[in-house]
C-alpha cells in the first residue's frame, strides 16, 4: 500500500527501483519484468485510477500475485511461469485483443526456406522481420557435403526425389561456379578508382556479384530470420502457419508456438491446438480458401493468361488530387471533408496546384515525409517480376500485396550484365533445367514444386497502395544502391502514376531514374570516410 503521505515508503521505493527507470518523473520505463507481467500490468492500468508504479505495487508486488518473484531473482530472468499462470486469468478476464499488443518477443527462425520466409513475412502489422541478405552473404557453403536447401518430406518420399535433388544441386553448383567468373568480369568492367578505398570497392563488388547471381538460388534455399512481434501479431501468425498446406510451414508454426509459450504464454495460448479459438480459426480459413479457389478456377478457365512481365497500373483514383488537397487543408479548417472536397473540385486548377505543391515544396530529401493527406489517393498495380525482387518489395507494410503461386510459367529475368558474356549460357541452362523439373513435379505437387523454382523466375502479384506509401517506396527503392530488379519496378510504378496524371510528379521528386554501375560504391565510400 502507499504511505500516508501519498508517496512511496523507502521500502516501496527500493522494491520499485528494480522495475522502473525512475521513481519521481511522470514519464518512465519498465525494466526487469517478463513480457507477460508487463502486458497484464498495462491491461489493468487502462481501468484503474492508480498510476502504473502504484498499480505495480498493489497488484504485482504486494497483492495476490506478489509471490511470483523469488527473493534472489530481480533481473531479467524472473519467475515467468509463475507469473504466466497467475496473470493468464487477468488477461482472459479483460478479453480485449488489444491487450495482446502490450507484450512481445524476439524469435529467431533458422534454416527456413526462402519460400517459407515469404509466408512468415506476409504478416504485416505488429511484427518486424529481418532476413539474411543474399547480397552480402554467399550461399555456396556445404554442410556434410550437402548444399543448404530445404528437402520437403513429401518430395523426398515421392517419385520426384532425384529430380528435385539433382536440380537444386545443379542450381547451387552453377551459382558457386559463376561467382569467381562474374567477379573477374566485373573487376575488368568496373576497375577500382584510386580514390576509392579497397574495402569499399570490395563490398560494392561483392554486392554486385551476388545481386547478379541470386536468381540461381532455388526457393528451397535455407535462410535465417529474426522477428520481433507483439503478442497479437504472434497469435495471428501462428494460426496462419498451422493451417498452411506446406509441411515446412506447419512445422515452423508448431516449433514457434513451443518456444513462444516459454516467453509469452498468455499471449499465444489461443494458438494451441486444444484451445477452442484455434479450431474455429482453422475451419474458417480452410473453408474460405477453398471457396475462393473454386471461384478463381470457375471464372478464369476460359480466358487466356497473360505472360507479359513488368508493371501495369490497373487503377488510379480519378478524384485523388482533390482528395489530397482537401485532406491537406482539413486539420487547419473548420469545414467538413465533404465541403473541402467540393471546394477543391470547383477552384481554378492553378489554385489546386498551389495547394498540392505546398505538400511537396518544403521537402529537401526523401525522409521528409509528405502530410498524411497524401494517403487519400490510391493505386493498384499488376506486377510480374522475378521472385527475388518480390522478396525485397514484399517487406513493405502499409499496403496490400497478394501473390500467386511461384511457377516457371511466366518466364525469368536474365541479369543484364551477363547477356553476351560467357556466363550467359550456364545461367540459361540452369533456368531451363529448373523449368523442366518444376513442370514435372507440379503435375502432382503444385505447391511443393515451388521449392525448385529459382529466384530469377517471375511471379505475379497485386500491389495496392496509397500515394504516400508509393512516395516512400519509389523514392527509397529507386536509389542507386538498390538491386536493379526492384529499382526498375519502383521507377516503372512512378512513371505509370505520372503518366496517369503529371501532377503526381510533385510527390515523387526524389525518385532516382539514373543508371548505375557499382550501385553501392558511393554508400560504402561514405561509410569508410
From Swiss-Prot:
The keyword Repeat applies. Gene3D superfamilies: 3.30.1360.170. This is UPF0159 protein CT_632. The keyword RNA-binding does not apply. PROSITE patterns: THYX. It holds the Pfam family Thy1. Transmembrane segments: none annotated. Residues 38-274, 309-511 form the ThyX domain. It comes from the Bacteria. One of its GO terms (biological process) is dTMP biosynthetic process. PANTHER family: FLAVIN-DEPENDENT THYMIDYLATE SYNTHASE. GO terms for molecular function: flavin adenine dinucleotide binding; NADPH binding; thymidylate synthase (FAD) activity; thymidylate synthase activity. Keywords: Repeat.
